[in-house]
Amino acid sequence: MVYESGNKPGPENPTFSSDLSLSDSLVKLKKKPCEVCGSDANELLMMTCFMCRDTREHTYCARVMFQRVPRLWICEECRDFSSVANKTANAQSSRTIQVEQVVVKQVRIDQTVPSPRTNQVVDNHQDPPIDQTDPSSTTIQVVDNENLIEAAPSSRSNQVVDNKDWIEAAPSLRSNQVVPVAPRIHEFTTDESSSPVSPCSLDDETNLFHFKYPSLSLPPLMKN
């Protein structure tokens, strides 16, 4: 057999050596044992991790048993790492969503609550307040007060008139209750004389009772 280059493939040829090293690396990669059982047998049932390309397991040695080698298989270490990364990403996304919701609420509040400056501008369109120091406004106020005083009668005077009418119309209750009482004179007899003696008499001018006793006789209550 004649070669065009004129050199036979051998250890001295660099092309041959590179091809040999590549084939050796492929053999070593294929010969890596199973991570579970440690055997490199049954190469057709050996699964290689799609992410790390380092972990190898048999279909019957994996935690979940497979009937055949799947197209994409991920080892447990890569799966745990991806789950942690997903949790971190989900937490960050949820936090971002919460911050966005807070910002949206603040924007809505700012839009719904009117500005006090705006209210002040709207209120300025109303009639200006009356200046108390202005003489024209003071004169108008005095005239209005006088008109009110002249137009409206005094409620106090009306009340006095009503009270007088009531006093004249209604008789006095105290005068109706006074009943004339006739004075009574009690007569007492003494041992000295059998004639009746009036020890007390009613004075018409002062309406007081005066007790009158004989000079030698004692009052009835003080006799022994």
Curated annotation (Swiss-Prot):
ATP-binding keyword on record: no
Gene Ontology biological-process annotations: negative regulation of transcription elongation by RNA polymerase II
Region (Disordered) location: 116-137
Keywords, sorted A to Z: Metal-binding, Transcription, Transcription regulation, Zinc, Zinc-finger
Binding positions for Zn(2+) 1 per the UniProt entry: 34, 37, 58, 61
Binding-site residues for Zn(2+) 2, renumbered to this chain: 49, 52, 75, 78
PHD-type zinc finger segments: 31-81
InterPro entries, A to Z: PHD1-3/5-6, Znf_FYVE_PHD, Znf_RING/FYVE/PHD
Main function: Together with AIPP3/BDT1, cooperates to form a BAH-PHD bivalent histone reader complex able to read histone H3 lysine 27 trimethylation (H3K27me3) histone marks in order to regulate transcription, especially to prevent early flowering; promotes AIPP3/BDT1 binding to H3K27me3.
Binding partners and assembly: Interacts directly with AIPP3/BDT1.
PANTHER family for the chain: GB|AAF26970.1-RELATED, PTHR33304
Protein name: PHD finger-containing protein 5
